[in-house]
Amino acid sequence: MHYNVKEICENYNFEISGVSFIGTPKDESMLFVTNKVKNMISNLIGHRNCLVFVETGIEVPDNLKEDNCILVVDDPQSEYAKLALKIEKSEKENSKNK
């Protein structure tokens, strides 16, 4: 998986190369945070270049926004899944064209 977040968040220019979970986030990954696990948002401290779909209403500290692309949405799990499918489809098409 390789995706430049600039495509959906023009203030950032970095690539994500995989997925992770807010319980154990990884740099350069895509993940989501719902109200159910909002207390884990602090797990992002020290991590960089993550694309994070965060449920509306969750407060995200400014320092996390500096190092990561935070997208506040109503249904983060669904938005995460949609983008993952889009990336997968794009990568399959690119591999066919090689």
Across the structure, where does each feature detected by a protein language model lie?
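Terminal amphipathic alpha-helical/low-complexity segments used for targeting or macromolecular assembly
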Residues: 1-97
